[in-house]
Each structure stands twice: as C-alpha cells, then as structure tokens.
Swiss-Prot record:
Zn(2+) binds at H563, H567, D641. Keywords: ATP-binding, Hydrolase, Membrane, Metal-binding, Metalloprotease, Mitochondrion, Mitochondrion inner membrane, Nucleotide-binding, Protease, Transmembrane, Transmembrane helix, Zinc. The active site is at E564. It comes from Drosophila melanogaster. This is ATP-dependent zinc metalloprotease YME1L. SUPFAM superfamilies: FtsH protease domain-like (SSF140990), P-loop containing nucleoside triphosphate hydrolases (SSF52540). ATP binds at G347, T348, G349, K350, T351. The gene is YME1L. The keyword Cell inner membrane does not apply. The chain crosses the membrane at residues 257-277. Residues 278-740 are mitochondrial intermembrane. PANTHER family: ATP-DEPENDENT ZINC METALLOPROTEASE YME1L1, METALLOPROTEASE M41 FTSH. In the N-terminal section; belongs to the AAA ATPase family. In the C-terminal section; belongs to the peptidase M41 family. One of its GO terms (biological process) is mitochondrial protein processing. It is a single-pass membrane protein. The lineage of its organism: Eukaryota, Metazoa, Ecdysozoa, Arthropoda, Hexapoda.
Length: 740
C-alpha cells in the first residue's frame, strides 16, 4: 500500500527559486504541520493502521529541545502509544529537522504578507507511508521542500529582522496592506503620481553579496535554479544602481516638491474664486448672502399696479413722499419714519407693495429675507445685519426691505440651550434705533405673524408705522379682477357676480384663479376666456380639481345626492342663510360633493341669527342621511360639516358672548397646570354643555325643515343623480315645481 499526504506550515521564500528537497525517514509515523498542539494519534482505517504525529512546526521553532521532547512524549501518552522506541525515533527525526529551520528563525502567522522583497509561502512536507495492507506500516519518508536555502536568506536581512519570532509588520507589509485597503491619503498620493519609494535595508551590503554571486557565476556553470538566482541578482542590482543615482534622486525630489506647490496653488485659487467679489473683497459673499441692492430702474411695478389695499397704499405713498422731498417735512421739524411694518395674511400683497415703493421712490433699495440671517456659525446673523445697514448708510436716503421679518425679529428667549440665539435681533434693534442714528434709512418689514415679533421691535422709533394689509373687500376684489382680466383675452364677464363669489380670496388667489381659467380655455380650444371658465377655476381653487366622472358605486352616489340635497334644502328655506350658487355630486378633492353659496353683499360683521343659520345649513347633510337611510346608515362624509359647526358654536360661547348660561365673557383655552389661567371644572363643564346644546338645537332645526319638505328633498336628489351639477336657477325651478 502507498499513500501520500501533503501538509504545510508558514515559511519564507525569495523570488521564484526552488531547490532539491531534503528526505527524512520516520519509521511507522506520518509527520505533518498543524495549527494545533503537537500530538500522536491513531488511524482507525480498515485498510491500514498508522500512528500520526501532528506537530505545529511554528511552535517548535520557539521551543527548546527539552520542551520538544516533553511535548512529544505527552502527546504519545494521551493517544495510548506506549512504544518507547517509536517515540524516540520520532523525536530524533524531528530534532534533526529543526536546525535547518532554525537558521531563519522567522515565523509569521499570515501568508502573502510582504517583508521587503521577501514573501511568505508554505513550507511543504510530503509524507509517504510504506507497508502491507492490514498491518502496521514499516516506514515513512518525509520530504521537506523549502523554497530557498537559509544561506541565501541570511545576507538579505539584518540580524534584528532574522531574530523576530512572532508575526510583525514592516514597511513592506504596511505598504502591501495599504495597496489592498487604500486610505484616502493613499488614494490622493496615487492620484498625484508620487515618485517611487526607495527600498529599505542595507542596499550596499546586499549589492556586494549579489556581485560576488555574479562573479562566481562567470567562473562556474550552474543549473536552471542557479541561473534564476543570477537573473534575479542582475535585476536587483540594476534597480539598486538606478535608485542610488544622486542625479535621479535629486530630480525626483525637485519634481515632487514642484508638484506639491502646483497642487496647493490650484486648490487655493479655486477656493478664493468662490468667495471673492468683483471689487476684490474676500468673503463678502459669505457675509451678505442675498442681501443685495436692487436697481430701481429694473423695477416696473408702481402703485397703479397695486389694487385692493387702498389704506396700505396711501401709507406707503407718504413714505415715498418723505424720500422724494425730505426738506418739505424737515422744514416743519418733522422726521422721516424709522420703519414701516406691513402685517397681513399670506397673499395679500405685502411684497408687491414693497416693490411698488422701490419703483416709485427712485432711491437705493436693499432687499433681504429674514431666514438669510440664520446661520450655523455663531455671530454670522448679527454680522450680516451690520453689513446690510453699513451698506445702506453709505447710500442714504434709501429703503431696506426685510421680508418675513418674524424669522429674525422673533421674541427673545432666555433658554440656556441657545445662549447666542438673541444676537441677531439685538443687533437689528441696535441698528434701527441705537446709539448711532441712521438718518435717511427707512426699514420696511413684512410679516404674517405679528404676535411672534419682539415688543422692542414694535415700539415707535423702530417701526413707527404699522400697516394692516387685509384680504380685499368686494370693491377691492373687483379692482383686482379687472386688473388681471386686462392681461388676458376674455368675453363679457360679470365682475359683480365673480367678486361676490370669491369672498375671502386674497390677491394671490384671484390671480391664480384667472390664470387657471386661461389655462382651461386653452385646453378647451377656446379663443377667449368665458365666465364658465372663471367659475370652473374658482371651484377648483375652492374645492380642488374635479374628477373625471362620479363614483361607480351607485349607492354612494345616492347617499351623496341626498346629503348635498339636505344642505341645499335647509339653506333655501332658512331666512338668514347665504343664497345658493351651485350643488354638485361630482367629487372634488377629498369631498364627494359640494354645495356652494354666494353672499348677496359683503359682510363686515356676523349676527347671531346668521351664525345659527350657517350651523343649520351645515347640519342639513347629516340630518338628511338619518331621515332617509336611518341612523345605522349615517356616513363619515359629514365630518367637515360637524367640524365647522363645532367651531362656530365654540366661538359663540367662548369668544363672542352669545350664550346666556356662560354670560358676557371670553374664555381662553386652558394652557395647562402651572400657567395661572387654568379654568375651573365647573366652568369647563358649563362651556361644554352650552356648546353641545347649541349644536343639538341646530340639528333638530335642520331635521324639522327636511321633514317639512320631504318631497322637494327627494326631487332635488333625483335631479342631482341625473344631472350631477345644478346651479341656483335649476334648484329654484325644481323646488317650485315640486311644491305645485
């Protein structure tokens, strides 16, 4: 029988040399390397029986002879091997192998790690057992194949390197590791094409040894293995000579220095180009951001383009007059106002008024947005305020417009978590009315959150004039609609009807409505915008986009028809209700149907009767569902109606003094314990009971109207199912026909 087993332990090799293997004989044993402890083991194979000696040769290199003997004997006892002759023979053979391995005395745990030009490789053992099948092997041949003789390794390493026993790192191993897992610095160096590094070690000594080898090769012939060594030596010396050249080293050094300087200059130039303005000041753009001066010649907006806010426009016209003729007022001892604060809901034209001031005043105009003063860096907001006012003072008389001023002028805080949060507003307060006066600089501020502003900012001397820019009334809406209609092609438009139907619309809403109407007309292929397009656009702004078709579920459509019909019936037969405009069961936005109203005239105050009528109309939808389909079939479609009705009832009780039980008082919402204004339990109970009573009474009134006009309600619902949308004239005709 014959078997061969190959095992390996770490060893070193240089280049691609090889040599003839050593042969050792071990009777009845098999020797191989292992990462575990040394041991002798028995094989239980039926075809042959053998005793295996498993040794960690890396461990053996660091052990003494006595220690090796003890380790082998202990392994034999643990495995039941009592043949002393066998143990001694194994120990002798192992001991005879160690000197050749101790010549190097370098053991590493990780293969393929480079040390200079030396790379780890496996030390091969091939063990061949001899003997008959079924009997104890008569002997074994151990073939040890080192990849290079220790004699050639020794000159290439210093004594300190050869004496290392455990795993270690050198410049070469670190370089190899960096090649496998390059860092950001390594990648940058490779991108910049750094010059090659010199090899570590004693180069003159290595070169001398290799020169001797070459000289010897000229006198004697060598086999292929020796020829490979000589070829390696020639290449190594050629590389060493080129690296040792002083001229080459200096050239590479100069090139590397020049390369570094060029890279630094390029990066510095790119960095400075981002933060240098046309006048040469560095970091100016960081400090001022978008706080730029606006050229009045580029602004084509005047007060003629501002409609629907005559009171605010008149206040700003006076400011413009101050700027145009300051001596007219200074002769009488008057002073220019320090600031004008524009307050109002979003979309009412505050920014448009500021643009009109810039276009009319013909003085330098600076614009900044409040959020631009907020920065991550501490102190940047205050610095931007200083820079803005410094630039404005140099161009006085001028106007500074700060949009969304509540971002920078919010109430100061005492929070220890934000100790620097007040720096920006403090700087703004100082610039507007501090120790140094800003003659000729007027500040325009715009906000829709006046209550959030610091009180010190609102006092006279900072914002002397406060202008309320509210939503336009009926006349204002007509003016705005007339202005925007001149910019499109349109048919005959009923401005009065359109203005009444857009109650509560801001100037921005009206502009958007007319733009939507123009888009719809273009999509329909019409040459001009008609009243129908404008009404469709208004419904889209109010209720959302219309869906293509009604719901495929007929039961849902029937419930929606009776629900919307309930709103219409209650509104039609309630005296103080708004007049009906349109009823539809076409889904729009989140709602499945909608009932629209148009007030007869502008309301500047609301009476209690009108509020109760509005609540009755809102309750009409849920009341219709209950009366027609039963209490088990009421739906969630009344959620919006109930929310609005609850809001009205709550305001009537808590804010408007319209409850006899609660009395003539206002009751603010409780802010919680510890705030000093917590409501008592009796008050809370009385308020809740009164709100519930008002809602219940409204619901009963709505049901009473629907019970009285059941026939009209049914006819209106059937018409909605047939025609989907009905206007005021259609509704009136259906109800009158049902009564006859």
């Amino acid at each position: 029988m014959f078997s061969t087993t190959t095992h390996s332990v770490p060893y070193l090799y240089l280049g691609n040399f090889s040599r003839k293997p050593h042969y050792y004989s071990v009777n009845r044993t098999k020797l191989h390397g292992s990462a575990g402890a040394a041991r002798l083991s028995k094989s239980t194979s039926t075809s042959s029986r053998s005793h295996d000696l498993v040794l960690d040769l890396r461990n053996l290199l660091s052990r003494s002879s006595a220690s090796i003997q003890g380790m082998v004997e202990r392994a034999a006892r643990l495995n039941g091997i009592l043949d002393r002759r066998l143990v001694d023979d194994v120990l002798a053979k192992v001991t005879s192998m160690l000197p050749s391995m101790r010549d190097v005395r370098v053991t590493l745990e990780e293969s393929a790690t480079q040390i200079g030009r030396v790379q780890l490789q496996n030390y091969q053992f091939e063990v061949s057992l001899t003997g008959a099948a079924g009997s104890v092997p008569t002997g074994a041949n151990v073939k040890v194949i080192p990849t290079i003789t220790p004699g050639l390794l020794r000159p290439l390493f210093s004594q300190q390197q050869l004496n290392q026993i455990r795993g270690f790192k050198t410049d070469r191993s670190i370089e190899a590791e960096q090649k496998r897992n390059p860092t950001m610095t390594s990648r940058l160096k490779n991108a910049l094409a750094n010059s090659p590094q010199r090899l570590d070690g004693d180069t003159p000594l290595q070169a001398e040894k290799l020169r001797r080898l070459l000289a010897k090769s000229e006198e004697h012939g060598f086999n292929k293995a020796e020829s490979l060594k000589i070829a390696f030596a020639e290449g190594y010396l050629a590389a060493a000579n080129s690296e040792d050249s002083p001229k080459s080293g200096k050239t590479m050094k100069y090139l590397k220095t020049l390369q570094t300087i060029v890279v630094i200059v390029v990066f510095l130039g790119i960095f400075l180009s981002f933060f240098t303005t046309s006048n040469g000041s560095v970091f100016r753009s960081i400090q001022l951001g978008n706080q730029v001066e606006v050229d009045p010649e580029e602004i084509n907006v005047t007060f003629e383009d501002v409609k629907g806010c005559d009171e605010a426009k008149q206040e700003l016209k006076e400011v413009v007059e101050f700027l145009k003729s300051p001596e007219k007022f200074s002769n009488l001892g008057g002073k220019l106002p320090k600031g004008v604060l524009l307050v109002g809901p979003p979309g009412t034209g505050k920014t448009l008024l500021a643009r009109a001031v810039a276009g009319e005043a013909k003085v330098p105009f600076f614009h900044a947005a409040g959020p631009e003063f907020d920065e991550v860096l501490v102190g940047q907001g205050a610095r931007r305020v200083r820079d803005l006012f410094k630039a404005a003072k140099a161009r006085a008389p001028c106007v500074i417009f700060i949009d969304e001023i509540d971002s920078v002028g919010a109430k100061r805080t005492n929070s220890v978590l934000h100790p620097y949060a007040n720096q920006t507003i403090n700087q703004l307060l100082s610039e507007m009315d501090g120790f140094h006066q800003n003659a000729g600089v007027i500040v325009l501020g715009a906000t829709n959150r006046r209550d959030d502003l610091d009180q010190a900012l609102l006092r006279p001397g900072r914002f002397d004039v406060e202008v309320m820019v509210s939503t336009p009334d009926f006349t204002g809406r007509k003016e705005i609609l007339s202005l925007y209609l001149t910019k499109i092609l349109h048919d005959e438009i009923d401005l009065d009807m359109l203005a009444r139907g857009t109650s509560g619309f801001t100037g921005a809403d009206l502009e958007n409505m007319i733009n939507q109407a123009a888009l719809r007309a273009a999509i329909d292929g019409a040459e001009t915008v008609s009243m129908k397009h404008l009404e469709t656009a208004r419904d889209k702004v109010l209720m959302g986009p219309e869906r293509k078709a009604r719901l495929p579920d007929e039961e849902a459509n029937t419930i929606t028809a009776y629900h919307e019909g309930g709103h219409a019936i209650v509104a039609f037969y309630t005296k103080e209700s708004h007049p009906l405009h349109k009823v539809t069961i076409m889904p729009r936005g989140p709602s499945l149907g909608h009932t629209a109203y148009i007030p007869e005239k502008e309301r500047y105050h609301v009476t209690k009767a009108q509020l109760l009528a509005m609540m009755d109309t809102m309750m009409g939808g849920r009341a219709a569902e209950e009366l027609v389909f039963g209490t088990d079939k009421i739906t969630s479609g009344a959620s919006s109606d109930l929310k609005q009705a609850t809001s009205i009832a709550t305001h009537m009780v808590r804010d408007w003094g319209m409850s006899d039980k609660v009395g003539l008082r206002t009751i603010e919402a409780s802010k919680g314990l510890g705030t000093g204004d917590t409501l008592g339990p009796n008050t809370i109970e009385a308020v809740d009971a009164e709100i519930k009573r008002i809602l219940s009474d409204s619901y009963e009134r709505a049901k009473a109207i629907l019970r009285k006009h059941t026939r009209e309600h049914k006819a209106l619902a059937e018409a909605l199912l047939k025609y989907e949308t009905l206007d005021a004239d259609d509704i009136k005709a259906i109800l009158n026909e049902s009564q006859t």
